[in-house]
Amino acid sequence: MARTNTRKAILAGGCFWGIQNLFRRQPGVISTRVGYTGGGTPNATYRNHGMHAEAVEIIYDPAITDYRTLLEFFFQIHDPTTRNRQGNDQGTSYRSAIFYLDDEQKKVALDTIAAVEASSLWPGKVVTEVSLAEDFWEAEPEHQDYLQHYPNGYTCHFVRPNWKLPRRAPADAKADS
């Protein structure tokens, strides 16, 4: 039976190999693919992606998980306080970014960032870019599911076991109180 009710998230947080590898195991995630987005270069490739970020496109089942849960996991597995860098990887390709698809995703992204900053779980200011999703250029086959094919391959992403974002009321709920 084909799934008809799915949603999409597009996130960038350093080298796409590690982000994809961790997200593909999350409950409710149906599929992932890596690629390039957030820059101006058409038909982006690994060798020519200009100002694009390495990103992962996540297709998920909203009956099992939601966008906020995916974003909380995103902030748990990468450092959102380092501009244009994750681990040894440096440059705009490795920036922290959330590429929203609609106004609701933008609202959830901004609220989640506010919660991350209020939590003090990270030592600095969150520098994650929040931008409207643009064209997503799928990366070459050798980059798809890279760490499944090469389990000991390079990654700078990991789940921080004690990192748990406290739930807080959304900004709109506070204004109505």
Curated annotation (Swiss-Prot):
Its EC number is 1.8.4.11. One of its GO terms (molecular function) is L-methionine:thioredoxin-disulfide S-oxidoreductase activity. GO terms for biological process: protein modification process. It is an enzyme of class 1 (oxidoreductase). Keywords: Oxidoreductase. It catalyses: L-methionyl-[protein] + [thioredoxin]-disulfide + H2O = L-methionyl-(S)-S-oxide-[protein] + [thioredoxin]-dithiol; [thioredoxin]-disulfide + L-methionine + H2O = L-methionine (S)-S-oxide + [thioredoxin]-dithiol. It comes from the Bacteria. Transmembrane segments: none annotated. Gene3D superfamilies: Peptide methionine sulphoxide reductase MsrA (3.30.1060.10). The active site is at 15. Has an important function as a repair enzyme for proteins that have been inactivated by oxidation. Catalyzes the reversible oxidation-reduction of methionine sulfoxide in proteins to methionine. Belongs to the MsrA Met sulfoxide reductase family. This is Peptide methionine sulfoxide reductase MsrA. It comes from Mycobacterium leprae (strain TN). The gene is msrA.
